Amino acid sequence: MASSSSPPAAMEVGESTNWTELPPELTSAILHRLGAIEILENAQKVCRSWRRVCKDPSMWRKIDMHNLGDLDDMDYNLEIMCRHAVDRSQGGLVDIGIWYFGTVDLLNYIAHRSSNLRSLRLIRCSQITDDGFVEAVVKLPLEELELSYCSFSVESLRVVGQCCLNMKTLKLNKHPQKENDDDALAIAETMPKLRHLQLCGNGLSDTGLNAILDNCSNLEHLDLRRCFNVNLVGDLQKRCFESVKVVRHPNDSIHDIDIGSSEDEDPYDFSDIDLMSGDDDFEGYYDFSGASDFSDYDQFDF
């Protein structure tokens, strides 16, 4: 006898997805594709179920604070927002990326509350001083570090290498530099376990490159794009290709390096979803505007 149950009706052409009725696991998978700013400013305001997912500490093991650097035109305070995201992780934060707005106070806030942090990315964070950077980083068990278009000294880099003994990935990207092997020698002296090294725009010469190859025997990926003081030909080129699996040449394109430029649109568009209004579960939602202060932030009950 044929089953009396009928198959579910196929979605009609033009029928839109009801984003608010997705299972929590699928909602979480979707929201993990978004940055922290999009989650806190938009996604968590969609409905109660999305807000519950957004409050789960597992959503905040990785925090991406990517922005375009137009800080004066924003209606919210990114530092306050970042602190809130760190708090939501409840100590489980393992990976964080900060673009433009990083400060010494914020970095120390992260370090004090994230003893398991393994990956730190600072892009164009000009307000962080060498002393403040070192004070925070020496407390962390970092394995991955990116310092792109920042102004930290070689002494800070050396201290990081001496304190973070399991450093496996370093990205130290700059605008093209005059010949200078200080960074390369500090890396060679203090980071022997490196597997991935990106030095776009660095001033290292053949001398610095040879020092890295001598001391970082585990290197698998070496990115020398825009390192125009390296003469990667002949014996040096042969040595690189024999000891390192992937080598990017000084003249290779840098189009795939994320340095804070605009990205494509978010993978999921929430523009057609009404944000929560008059919802009892959403009363007291925290305001990330510049008018908010840290005392209000500390007292807010999430």
Swiss-Prot record:
The keyword Nucleus applies. Pathway: Protein modification; protein ubiquitination. One of its GO terms (cellular component) is cytoplasm. Residues 16-63 form the F-box domain. Its main location: nucleus. One of its GO terms (biological process) is protein ubiquitination. Keywords: Nucleus, Ubl conjugation pathway. CDD domains: F-box_AtSKIP19-like. Transmembrane segments: none annotated. SUPFAM superfamilies: RNI-like. SMART domains: FBOX, LRR_CC. InterPro entries: F-box_dom, Leu-rich_rpt_Cys-con_subtyp, LRR_dom_sf. It is found in: Nucleus. Part of a SCF (ASK-cullin-F-box) protein ligase complex. Interacts with CUL1 and SPK1B/ASK2. The F-box is necessary for the interaction with ASK proteins. Component of SCF(ASK-cullin-F-box) E3 ubiquitin ligase complexes, which may mediate the ubiquitination and subsequent proteasomal degradation of target proteins. This is F-box protein SKIP19.
